[in-house]
Amino acid sequence: MPLVAHSNLPTFERLRKEGGTVLPNDYALHQDIRALHIGLLNMMPDAALAATERQFFRLVGESNQIAQFYMHPFTLAELPRGPGGQAHVERYYETFDTIQREGLDALIITGANVSQPDLALEPFWEPLAEVVEWAWKNVTSTLCSCLTTHAVMQSRYGERRRHRGAKLWGVFDHRVVDRTHPLVAGVNTRFDVPHSRFNDVSREQFDRHRLKVLVESERAGVHLAVSEDGFRLVFFQGHPEYDSISLLKEYKREVLRFVNGEREEFPPLPERYLSPQAAAILEEHRERVEQARQRRVPAPELPEPLLVGRLDNTWHDSALAVVNNWIGNVYQFTNHDRRIPFRPGVDPNAPLNWSR
């Protein structure tokens, strides 16, 4: 939470210039403290619906132990749902009409499964664009996760994602490339982020539209960037919300696809994710699966209990720090009325009053 500059101590101004969160005393005296309302547009398929809720709810809830958060999950009617997923949505989710009527302080938009080479052909394309446009006009800041980053870059900026040729899959080292921005204030200057994607939006594509890249990787490319105003759109290409076992679950799914004949080659191990012991266990399991396939006998199950305790999480603390900075800035600049994006005096074109 922010410091209050209640005196002329030069340290306050120094910290503010370094990107720290410092409130002017006159504003702090009149600040109306309230809970924040954060929307979660969950576009994930049924099998990942609840897990994605937990990941993002946990990321928000653990990032700040003082503020109170009301989470408002909703989805798009155009996304295909089975009976179980539809029942979950109908019972627990709000409608976009309700979201628009009551307002949000901030919005998180998840990724989604895709089947078309052009995102504009996906069933979520037009309704997602409607949500993003509404949020741009009515919400303090919107955080776009992976696939949504690609969709917004295409719909809003005309930049199509590009196929990498091979899947980027694993945990990769990243570096903060602009330490002055408030979103990365106090964050480790080097940290890990999981990635799981075939496609990429490059640094050059962000730069063409004066979008500011804050965190990137030599191997994985851009992870964190922001819109030209510095805050109203926040772009992730990685998956900082992932649990320690998320990549293991993805690996298990790909192994099952191999077993069922849905892919020809056995899946590779995620990069920089597994300890030597865990990698050895999975290599032995691969040999047993391939032998079972040759003999046409049932394949052995993935030995998850042996693996879970051998998985390191090298990204969660930094993810919490970035999200905490995001929430802290939303808290400072949002209006008391959550149907209005900014408090009086905040310039929507430069809400952070931050100079690039």
From Swiss-Prot:
Coiled coil: none annotated. GO terms for molecular function: homoserine O-acetyltransferase activity; homoserine O-succinyltransferase activity. It catalyses: L-homoserine + succinyl-CoA = O-succinyl-L-homoserine + CoA. The record marks 113, 147 as: Important for acyl-CoA specificity. InterPro entries: Class_I_gatase-like, MetA_family. Its main location: cytoplasm. HAMAP family: MetA_acyltransf. Belongs to the MetA family. This is Homoserine O-succinyltransferase. It comes from Thioalkalivibrio nitratireducens (strain DSM 14787 / UNIQEM 213 / ALEN2). The gene is metAS.
